[in-house]
Amino acid sequence: MLHLENIRVRQGSFTLSAHLTIAKGARVALMGASGSGKSTLLSTLSGFLWPDAGRITMAGADVAKTPVADRPISILFQDGNLFPHLSVFDNVALGIRPNLKLGSEDERRVTRALTQVGLEGMEQRKPSALSGGQQSRVALARMLLRDKPVALLDEPFSALDPGLRREMLSLVRKLCDETGQTLIMATHDLRDAERLCDRVLLLDDGKVVLDAPLAEAVANNAEPLRPWM
C-alpha cells in the first residue's frame, strides 16, 4: 500500500495537503482543474518535490528517504521525454541503464518490453520516424521496463486524437492486468478515467474534495465531479 500521511507541500503561495491510502493494484484517476495540485502531487510522489510536512510510505518504508532512482515509482509524462538522436531501442533501454551499457539480459528485457507494447521490428527507428501513438508506446515501454510497483501517468496521452487515446488506455489497462501495478493517472477527461480507473481523487485548491469509487461517483452524479460530466 501507498500511504500519504498528512503531507503538506508548499509551492509559493500554493499549498497541497493530503492524507490518503492507495491500495496495491488500485487504478486511480487524479482529476481537478488546472492549478488544483495534480502535478504537485505527482511530482511529490515521484521525488521531484519534497513534502514540507508529513511523509509518504510504501510497504512501511519512507519513500522520501529512498534515492530517486531506487524509489518504487515510475512516471510517464505527456511528452514522453524521448531523445531524438537515439533509436527506439536505446530510448527504452535508458529506463534501466542511463549509460546504455547493456548486458545480454538487459537486451532481452528491452526487446520484451517493446514486444509488449507492439513495437517489435521498430527497434532501430528514430522517434521522428514514428507516429504520435508509436512515440507514446516507446515511453510506455520504458516505464514498463523499470518494473516499479507504482506507475504515475501525468496526462500522458492528452495530445493524441480520441481514437489513439482509447487504444493507449486499453494497452495500459492490459499491461496493468498483467503486472498488477498500482496506477495513478492525472487526467482532465472523465471518459479516459472511466476506461482505465476504478477510483477518483478530485483536487481543488490543493485539497482532496472527492475520494470515491469512480463508477459510484459517476452514478451518483457526485457534485464535485459534475463539471467533468
Curated annotation (Swiss-Prot):
SUPFAM superfamilies: P-loop containing nucleoside triphosphate hydrolases. It comes from the Bacteria. One of its GO terms (cellular component) is plasma membrane. ATP binds at G32, A33, S34, G35, S36, G37, K38, S39. Its EC number is 7.6.2.15. GO terms for molecular function: ABC-type thiamine transporter activity; ATP binding; ATP hydrolysis activity. The keyword Electron transport does not apply. It is a peripheral membrane protein. InterPro entries: AAA+_ATPase, ABC_SmlMolc_Importer, ABC_transporter-like_ATP-bd, ABC_transporter-like_CS, P-loop_NTPase. Residues 2-229 form the ABC transporter domain. Its main location: membrane. It catalyses: thiamine(out) + ATP + H2O = thiamine(in) + ADP + phosphate + H(+). Keywords: ATP-binding, Cell inner membrane, Cell membrane, Membrane, Nucleotide-binding, Translocase, Transport. It is found in: Cell inner membrane. It is an enzyme of class 7 (translocase). Belongs to the ABC transporter superfamily. Thiamine importer (TC 3.A.1.19.1) family. The complex is composed of two ATP-binding proteins (ThiQ), two transmembrane proteins (ThiP) and a solute-binding protein (ThiB). Part of the ABC transporter complex ThiBPQ involved in thiamine import. Responsible for energy coupling to the transport system. This is Thiamine import ATP-binding protein ThiQ. The gene is thiQ.
